[in-house]
């Protein structure tokens, strides 16, 4: 498991000896929030992005919101961001810590700046460290609204506590935006309409789809499509990554 860049290098190095590789790489998950979603869907999705300081490959960093509740979703996301504390890991309490390195911190800062430069609305957070933290690789929980699909923050894996919120008109547009990415690890659906959820889940080009906050159980295969990797870990599918097929004739 690692970045898509690391996965490409591993694949190239394995090619000379024709080694098989199982890659679980980056992601740019979409979280499709319909007007009939449960009351906690928006806050749950935002917290999922900010958890682990955003350093999760399956984080739902693109929140797609049905237009009729877009303003409500934006306000809830801003509230969650403003109430998410950032502090050192040794401090007791409910807060998120720093990102892993200066390289990652600098990358996140550049991508936040790119969102500003490309015209997205910075609704919460922003560049530089949170107030009161003058050193360390701490990133402000950041919310961008009015994001366009062409922007870098909508396409590149940021791997930090940064969420982009985009509106959609109908199912078809939501599916199109969700699939318009080089990645395909995990997508999310929020709706009380089970038939709609099932219909959309079948059309999403990702290795995993989570519906209404129901996490995956132990033994389920974990992995993605496209530049999110190949192969699976977990359950019987994970074990099969280590097996070879053998054909034998004349056995009986």
Protein language model annotation of sequence segments:
Residues 2-148, 211:
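ALDH superfamily catalytic-core signature
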Residues 32, 112, 131, 138-252:
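Conserved C-terminal structural/oligomerization subdomain of aldehyde/semialdehyde dehydrogenase
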């Amino acid at each position: 498991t690692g970045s898509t860049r690391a996965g490409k290098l591993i694949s190239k190095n394995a090619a000379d000896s024709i080694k098989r590789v199982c890659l679980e790489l980056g992601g740019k998950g979409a979280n499709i929030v319909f007007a009939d979603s449960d009351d906690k869907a928006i806050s749950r999705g935002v917290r999922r992005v900010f958890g682990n300081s955003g350093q999760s490959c399956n984080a739902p960093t693109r929140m797609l919101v049905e237009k009729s509740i877009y303003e409500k979703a934006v306000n809830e996301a801003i509230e969650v961001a403003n109430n998410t504390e950032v502090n050192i890991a040794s401090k007791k309490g409910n807060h998120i810590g720093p990102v892993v390195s200066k390289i990652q911190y600098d990358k996140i800062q550049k991508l936040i700046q790119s969102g500003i430069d490309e015209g997205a609305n910075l609704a919460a957070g922003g560049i530089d460290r949170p107030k009161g933290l003058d050193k360390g690789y701490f990133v402000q929980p950041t919310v961008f609204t009015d994001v366009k699909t062409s922007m870098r923050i909508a396409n590149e894996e940021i791997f930090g506590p940064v969420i982009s919120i985009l509106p959609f008109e109908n199912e078809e547009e939501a599916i199109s935006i969700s699939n318009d990415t080089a990645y395909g690890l995990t997508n999310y659906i929020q709706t009380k309409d089970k038939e709609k959820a099932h219909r959309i889940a079948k059309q999403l080009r990702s290795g995993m789809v989570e519906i209404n906050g129901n996490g995956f159980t132990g033994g389920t295969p974990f992995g993605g499509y496209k530049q999110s990797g190949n192969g699976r870990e977990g359950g019987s599918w994970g074990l099969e990554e280590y097996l070879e097929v053998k054909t034998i004739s004349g056995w009986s």
